[in-house]
Amino acid sequence: MSSGTPYIGSKISLISKAQIRYEGILYTIDTENSTVALAKVRSFGTEDRPTDRPAPPREEVYEYIIFRGSDIKDITVCEPPKASHALPQDPAIVQSSLGSAPAASYQPSVPYSPFRGMPTYSQLAATSLLSQQYAASLGLEKLGSPTASAGASSSCSSPSPQPVAPEPDVPAEPPQLSQNAGYPSIPVRKSPMVEQAVQTGPLENQAQKKVQQAKGAPVGQRGVRQSGPQSQPAPLNVPPPAAPVLGTINDENRRPPRRRSGNRRTRNRSRGQNRPTTVKENPIKFEGDFDFETANAQFNREELDKEFKDKLNFKEEKPEKEGEEKTDSGVETQNSDGNPEEDPLGPNTYYDRSKSFFDNISSEMKSRRTTWAEERKLNTETFGVSGRFLRGRSFRGGFRGGRGSAAPRRNQTTQRAGTGRV
């Protein structure tokens, strides 16, 4: 990487369009996404530059910040890259580790050595983006102990038992970078302006601190292990504990799901009445057009009339005698003993013009007729008791909406009419 771009590993001073100056080590320049990535970045604020939103300097050192190229105002190279003392490019090397070094002796060439198996900067940023939403969208991560990156509100809101300082095991980062070589190459989405990221940093830190308190794990148990030369402080692997913060924040910002029930009542419907469900019936499929000629050929009106007459057994009509009294055979009549009279037409005669004007086709026979009591009982069993019987006397809501019976009210009207006080 250093051979292709000579400024990789140099100390860069960058000024954004918000007049905020940043200093860090140039890590990568992405020409496709038009982004510039700096490592070990520190913000110096606006520094009396004219701006609508002045920002003070910050003491935090971020692991990396990805800047959008369109929001960069000026870039200056402060120091050239230092000589590289890293291992040569040997494909046989899978993992390496260096002993602890003093914090002052910073070797920028070690974490930026051109390993073949090391993923690009966009891949490392993408893995952190997937596990931490705020740090992903803002493109930044604090440098320091893992406790400072997991619950990073120590420098903003409350004092922390562990001081925020650069890691003495900075050269131990290449093993962690080589372990991340198996991540797929996921494109990094463009982050918003960095000045917004700096302002929303404490909010992320407070959310992460709440997650630690909920789990009940003390901060001291998550310290960096520096007991031997094999110590590997994984600053890039710390963001996974912040994954529960995503669900908490997303659940708070998400609308509650709407409850859908098929038995939802409406205001205009009566109590206990459910909404009718519409069932889609399958449409009838016709194979072809209707053939009228074939249907007319099958329809013979003369044969149907003959068959109808045979079933009804019509008799020849006789001339009606003048002055003959006509009796209604369809009306049930009873004698004084209560027995029904005999049918003048006979049991098998449906219509005889000489005997009666009425027929026995559409009317019920006397043997099948019911009395008014039986008919009333049948109506009650079929339709239930009528509601008009509830408005009797001594009930509220009688005739004309008055209390009690309706008879006194009629008497009052009659008396008023007699006295002329209508």
Swiss-Prot record:
Record domain Sm: where: 1-81
**Where does the signal peptide begin and end?**
none
Q: Provide the residue span(s) of the region labelled Disordered.
A: 145-290, 309-354, 394-422
Specify the DFDF domain's residue ranges.
278-314
Q: Which GO terms describe its cellular component?
A: ribonucleoprotein complex
Q: List GO BP terms, alphabetically.
A: regulation of translation
User: In which residue ranges is the amino acid composition biased (Polar residues)?
Assistant: 411-422
Q: Where is the composition biased (Low complexity)?
A: 145-159, 206-217
Family annotation (CDD domains): LSm14_N
Pro residues biased stretches: 160-174
Q: Which domain of life is it from?
A: Eukaryota
Chain location of the short sequence motif TFG box per the record: 367-387
User: What protein family is recorded?
Assistant: Belongs to the LSM14 family.
Q: Subunit structure of this entry?
A: Component of a ribonucleoprotein (RNP) complex, at least composed of cpeb1, lsm14b/rap55b, ddx6/Xp54, ybx2/frgy2, pat1/P100, eif4enif1/4E-T and eif4e1b. Different translationally-repressed mRNP complexes probably exist that contain either lsm14a/rap55a or lsm14b/rap55b depending on the developmental stage. Component of a ribonucleoprotein (RNP) complex, composed at least of elavl1/elrA and/or elavl2/elrB, igf2bp3/vg1RBP, ddx6/Xp54, ybx2/frgy2, lsm14b/rap55b and, in a subset of RNP complexes, stau1/staufen.
Q: What is the recorded function of this protein according to its Swiss-Prot or TrEMBL entry?
A: May be involved in the storage of translationally inactive mRNAs and protect them from degradation. Plays a role in control of mRNA translation.
Q: What is this protein called?
A: Protein LSM14 homolog B-A
